[in-house]
């Protein structure tokens, strides 16, 4: 992050703009809206500045840049068409430890001005860090179309109710649940937009009188195979509403960065052959936190119901009467194969696909005879340590030794690596790959040479 987004309280604080043209006028308008005590220093001024000065809204200082004007300032903007003057303003501000924006020169500035969506008191700022102002403007226009004009009225009304909410609801969890009901109430929003005070009061009283659901809940969310762009919209909504997120090592840092900032995070990383936290203890963590009335998200790589032990976790909650729901995710087989250019089914090569765990319970055995059948694709999860056995068993039960195989490491991420060969090489290839990795076996693997789009590795 090259710039820290902040919102400045400038009301009744001295600010300086150097420049008297159209660009300076746009900056001045923003500072005046923010309530700043504004001084504008320039050789000449466009008429709007004179209008503002005559109305007592700002002070004009005609002449060359006078750096003593910075002595009482909190913030400065250099908006002339002379790069040398702009640099002088920046240097003078820097020497006084005053933040200075230099128009169209982000490297010379100590702060930049974002594109703004104003639904006061709700403000949304969009910035490209000065690298692409046009992109920031396009995003702002998109957001403008998505955010209702009356959103500011809703936010302002919420501010009026804060003391009452704090008095009526004792815990942060209760208050958050109330506000969630408040902000999704379309009738209230429309009544505020229509200035229908009677309807606003009636809806408000109904919201305060309705009992809150004090029970906690658990939501199993599939995070997908790695690329944060593959997280579903519903999954994103859930992790941004969570009180606590219980996650494993297959959840990428990019996805964890999307979690609500003040949510508690509990790492229960697991991998085949090693469990940081035993499964039964994970079950109890989910149960214990939900019984405290918290909204718990169990965030799992891939899909929670495909070799994710999600069913076991939900059984514990079901027996305890804890409400739960499931948000599916893109499973590793689908994501990794797509990002490797390997279609799992193809009318010429595979009429079915089998998802198989390579990590069996002690004494377990797979149906190797059916797995070795023709015209299908096999995808082994957690199979690296068993790769040599998989190779041996499939050949022993009749699969052709030259059957194409691929191993996908860190699938769908920028670190994705794919090694491929034939079945007789599977055990050897597995030595070149680190977990997390997926094994794909089938004629469709040969299509990778033509269909690989994501990586040349």
Curated annotation (Swiss-Prot):
Active site feature: 248 (proton acceptor), 270 (proton donor)
Binding residues annotated for NAD(+), in chain numbering: 22-23, 43-44
Assembly information from the UniProt record: Homodimer.
Chain positions covered by the region annotation Uroporphyrinogen-III C-methyltransferase: 216-448
Organism of origin: Salmonella typhimurium (strain LT2 / SGSC1412 / ATCC 700720)
Gene that encodes it: cysG
Gene3D superfamilies: Cobalt-precorrin-4 Transmethylase, Domain 1 (3.40.1010.10), Methyltransferase, Cobalt-precorrin-4 Transmethylase, Domain 2 (3.30.950.10), NAD(P)-binding Rossmann-like Domain (3.40.50.720), Sirohaem synthase, dimerisation domain (1.10.8.210), Siroheme synthase, domain 2 (3.30.160.110)
Annotated binding of S-adenosyl-L-methionine, by residue: 225, 301-303, 306, 331-332, 382, 411, 437
Keywords of the record: Cobalamin biosynthesis, Lyase, Methyltransferase, Multifunctional enzyme, NAD, Oxidoreductase, Phosphoprotein, Porphyrin biosynthesis, S-adenosyl-L-methionine, Transferase
Enzyme Commission code(s) on record: 2.1.1.107, 1.3.1.76, 4.99.1.4
Effect of residue 128 to D: Abolishes the methyltransferase activity and reduces 10 and 5-fold the dehydrogenase and ferrochelatase activities, respectively
Catalytic reactions on record: uroporphyrinogen III + 2 S-adenosyl-L-methionine = precorrin-2 + 2 S-adenosyl-L-homocysteine + H(+); precorrin-2 + NAD(+) = sirohydrochlorin + NADH + 2 H(+); siroheme + 2 H(+) = sirohydrochlorin + Fe(2+)
The protein's name: Siroheme synthase
Keyword Lyase: yes
């Amino acid at each position: 992050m090259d710039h820290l987004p902040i919102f400045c309280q400038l009301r009744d604080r001295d600010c300086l703009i150097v420049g008297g043209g159209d660009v300076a006028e746009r900056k001045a308008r923003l500072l005046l809206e923010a309530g700043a005590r504004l001084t504008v220093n320039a050789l000449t001024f466009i008429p709007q500045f004179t209008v503002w000065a005559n109305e007592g809204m700002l002070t004009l200082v005609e002449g060359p840049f006078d750096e003593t004007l910075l002595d009482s300032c909190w913030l400065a903007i250099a908006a002339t068409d002379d790069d040398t003057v702009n640099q002088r303003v920046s240097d003078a501000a820097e020497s006084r430890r005053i933040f200075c924006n230099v128009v169209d020169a982000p490297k010379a500035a100590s702060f930049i001005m974002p594109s703004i969506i104003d639904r006061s008191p709700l403000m949304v700022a969009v910035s490209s860090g000065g690298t692409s102002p046009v992109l920031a403007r396009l995003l702002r226009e998109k957001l403008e179309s998505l955010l209702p004009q009356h959103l500011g009225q809703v936010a302002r009304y919420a501010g009026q109710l804060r003391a009452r909410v704090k008095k009526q609801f004792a815990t942060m969890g209760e208050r958050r649940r109330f506000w969630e009901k408040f902000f999704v109430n379309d009738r209230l929003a429309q009544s505020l937009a229509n200035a229908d005070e009677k309807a606003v009061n009636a809806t408000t009283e109904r919201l305060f009188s309705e009992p809150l659901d004090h029970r906690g809940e658990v939501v199993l969310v599939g995070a997908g195979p790695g690329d944060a762009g593959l997280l579903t919209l519903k999954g994103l909504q859930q992790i941004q509403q969570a009180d606590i997120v219980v996650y494993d090592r297959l959840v990428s840092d990019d996805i964890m960065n999307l979690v609500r900032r003040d949510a508690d995070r509990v790492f229960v990383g697991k991998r085949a052959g090693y469990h940081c936290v035993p499964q039964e203890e994970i079950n109890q963590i989910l149960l214990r936190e939900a019984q405290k009335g918290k909204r718990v998200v169990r965030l799992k790589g891939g899909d929670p119901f495909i070799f994710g032990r999600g069913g076991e976790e939900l059984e514990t909650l079901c027996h305890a009467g804890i409400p739960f729901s499931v948000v599916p995710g893109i499973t590793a087989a689908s994501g990794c194969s797509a990002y490797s250019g390997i279609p799992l089914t193809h009318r010429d090569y595979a009429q079915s696909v089998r998802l198989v765990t390579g990590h069996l319970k002690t004494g377990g055995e797979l149906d190797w005879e059916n797995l070795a059948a023709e015209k299908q694709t096999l995808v082994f999860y957690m199979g690296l340590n068993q790769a040599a056995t998989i190779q041996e068993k499939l050949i022993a039960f009749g699969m052709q030794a030259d059957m194409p195989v691929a191993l996908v490491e860190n699938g769908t991420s920028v670190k994705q690596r794919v090694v491929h060969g034939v079945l007789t090489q599977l055990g050897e290839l597995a030595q070149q790959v680190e977990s997390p990795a997926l094994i794909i076996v089938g004629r469709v693997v040969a299509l990778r040479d033509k269909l690989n789009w994501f990586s040349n590795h």
